[in-house]
């Protein structure tokens, strides 16, 4: 073996980190970045710079490179592709050896792949489009505490999507009035109600009182309906210690499900809470507050499909996933792609949906996608078509805004859902025949009839900002 020599100075990244003939290993973590390089920086150099800064490199040669096998540990940019319809950017595919990352640590993966490299001057903008986690790494992560099938068995609910509702107004209610709103929704036919993501423990409603009144409402609704009910008690807190304190109290009250804001609260806290839920048999609902700050810019940040993969590794039984048809951002094909990423055991590369790699989850349980944001009964046929049964459809204003009150709003949604599921099971194309299906069901449900009249003119027809690159052609 020849002796290594140290040559001080600065050299182009491509000489070390650009390897177009690299043979990708089954154990490599693969990343696809969309890069807009600075003027004068060519594609190979920009891609190699990203590989270097997100793995072993720095701005100059250092003598301590000789103390390790740099060729083994470095990231490698192995392929470059054009972005359809965008001449300013390109895709760079980078392979990282699995030993660069701590086992079971989403925090460590994000620190490397989305750390200092995103402020690197060699690139004008940078976006992490997708990541392939090898099964060898997936197996080191805990994943969802319970999973889709276990949740079905806990709740004894099968053959349809769950129905939920975020209590409104999101802020300002007293704990007792909050509990009253929960009870009305649950007795009307919903499966779940939810704390809004910014409901923590404010002066108008401290967390302990909220938990008490909500659980009283749940138990009362369960006795009256004979169904299991739940409310996503938000345990997100200023510190991990306080978060676990709230989770323990929810357990004392026999709450079936709790909630965490996983991006604002952080992946370290989220993984710890997921482990706690797994040990204690409690479902974990995950809200994605702050995601659009990170994923909405089509040229810089992290695509939501990556955030969804990170959540599945970190742990959560539900995750907000957009609606396609509601008030929030979400391209239809891209949304269908990350819904599959959340639920399925194996997902094949599919550029038409923005999926850049095959992803094998092995036996890791799936995550229930949650559709929430500006939806109402008229959206039900599309939602059932898009999301299927293993989903939770959450109607906040679409429940609480009913002219006859919360219980009537809940009943309208339940009738609409069951009518669509029954029609689908008969082979009816429900998205095409949705109006007829709902109109027929409304003949036997005055609550649904009023809901349809109330929201018949409500649409959110704004164009999607973050379009799939294939749609740019």
Swiss-Prot record:
RuBisCO catalyzes two reactions: the carboxylation of D-ribulose 1,5-bisphosphate, the primary event in carbon dioxide fixation, as well as the oxidative fragmentation of the pentose substrate. Both reactions occur simultaneously and in competition at the same active site. The keyword rRNA-binding does not apply. InterPro entries: RuBisCO, RuBisCo_large_chain_AS, RuBisCO_lsu_C, RuBisCO_lsu_C_sf, RuBisCO_lsu_fd_N, RuBisCO_lsu_N_sf, RuBisCO_lsuI. The modification N6-carboxylysine is found at residue 194. Its EC number is 4.1.1.39. Signal peptide: none annotated. Heterohexadecamer of 8 large chains and 8 small chains. Mg(2+) binds at residues 194, 196-197. It comes from Nitrosomonas europaea (strain ATCC 19718 / CIP 103999 / KCTC 2705 / NBRC 14298). The record marks 327 as: Transition state stabilizer. It catalyses: 2 (2R)-3-phosphoglycerate + 2 H(+) = D-ribulose 1,5-bisphosphate + CO2 + H2O; D-ribulose 1,5-bisphosphate + O2 = 2-phosphoglycolate + (2R)-3-phosphoglycerate + 2 H(+). It is an enzyme of class 4 (lyase). Binds 1 Mg(2+) ion per subunit. Keywords: Calvin cycle, Carbon dioxide fixation, Lyase, Magnesium, Metal-binding, Monooxygenase, Oxidoreductase. Substrate binds at residues 116, 166, 170, 288, 320, 372. This is Ribulose bisphosphate carboxylase large chain. The basic functional RuBisCO is composed of a large chain homodimer in a 'head-to-tail' conformation. In form I RuBisCO this homodimer is arranged in a barrel-like tetramer with the small subunits forming a tetrameric 'cap' on each end of the 'barrel'. The active site is at residues 168, 287. Belongs to the RuBisCO large chain family. Type I subfamily. GO terms for molecular function: magnesium ion binding; monooxygenase activity; ribulose-bisphosphate carboxylase activity. The keyword Magnesium applies. Its cofactor is Mg(2+). GO terms for biological process: reductive pentose-phosphate cycle.
């Amino acid at each position: 073996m020849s002796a290594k020599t140290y040559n001080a100075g600065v050299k182009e990244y491509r000489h070390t980190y650009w390897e177009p003939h690299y043979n990708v290993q089954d154990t490599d973590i693969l990343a696809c970045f969309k890069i807009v390089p600075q003027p004068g920086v060519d594609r190979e150099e920009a891609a190699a710079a990203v590989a270097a800064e997100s793995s072993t490199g720095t701005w100059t040669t250092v003598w301590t490179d000789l103390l390790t096998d740099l060729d083994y540990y470095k990231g490698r940019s192995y392929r470059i592709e054009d972005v359809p319809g965008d001449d300013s950017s390109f895709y760079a595919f980078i392979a990282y050896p699995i030993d660069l990352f701590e086992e079971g640590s989403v925090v460590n993966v994000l620190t490397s792949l989305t750390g200092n490299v995103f402020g690197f001057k060699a690139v004008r903008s940078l976006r992490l489009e997708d990541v392939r986690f090898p099964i060898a790494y997936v197996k080191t992560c805990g994943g969802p505490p319970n999973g889709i099938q276990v949740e079905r068995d806990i709740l004894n609910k099968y053959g349809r999507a769950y129905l939920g509702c975020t209590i409104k107004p999101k802020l300002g209610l007293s704990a007792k009035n909050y509990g009253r709103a929960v009870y009305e929704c649950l007795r009307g036919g919903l499966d779940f109600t939810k704390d809004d993501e910014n409901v923590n423990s404010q002066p108008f409603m401290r967390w302990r009182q909220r938990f008490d009144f909500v659980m009283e409402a749940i138990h009362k609704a369960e006795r009256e309906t004979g169904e299991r009910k739940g409310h996503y008690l938000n345990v997100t807190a200023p510190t991990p210690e306080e978060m676990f304190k709230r989770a323990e109290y929810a357990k004392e009250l026999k709450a079936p499900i709790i909630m965490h804001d996983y991006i604002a609260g952080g992946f370290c806290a989220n993984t710890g809470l997921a482990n706690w839920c797994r040990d204690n048999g409690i479902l974990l609902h995950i809200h994605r507050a702050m995601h659009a700050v990170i994923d909405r810019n089509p040229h810089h940040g992290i695509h939501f499909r990556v955030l969804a993969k990170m959540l599945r590794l970190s742990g959560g039984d539900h995750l907000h996933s957009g609606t396609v048809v509601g008030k929030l951002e979400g391209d239809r094909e891209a949304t269908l792609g990350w819904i599959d990423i959340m639920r399925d055991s194996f997902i094949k590369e599919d550029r038409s949906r923005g999926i850049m790699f095959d992803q094998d989850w092995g036996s890791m349980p799936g995550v229930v996608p949650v559709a929430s944001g500006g939806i109402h009964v008229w959206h039900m046929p599309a939602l059932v078509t898009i999301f299927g049964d293993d989903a939770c459809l959450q109607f906040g204003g679409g429940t609480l805004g009913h002219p006859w009150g919360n219980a009537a709003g809940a009943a309208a949604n339940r009738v609409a859902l069951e009518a669509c599921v029954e029609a689908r099971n008969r082979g009816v194309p429900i998205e095409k025949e949705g109006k007829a299906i709902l109109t027929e069901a409304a003949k036997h449900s005055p609550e649904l009839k009023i809901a349809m009249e109330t929201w018949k003119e409500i649409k959110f027809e704004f164009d999607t900002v973050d379009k799939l690159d294939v749609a740019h052609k």
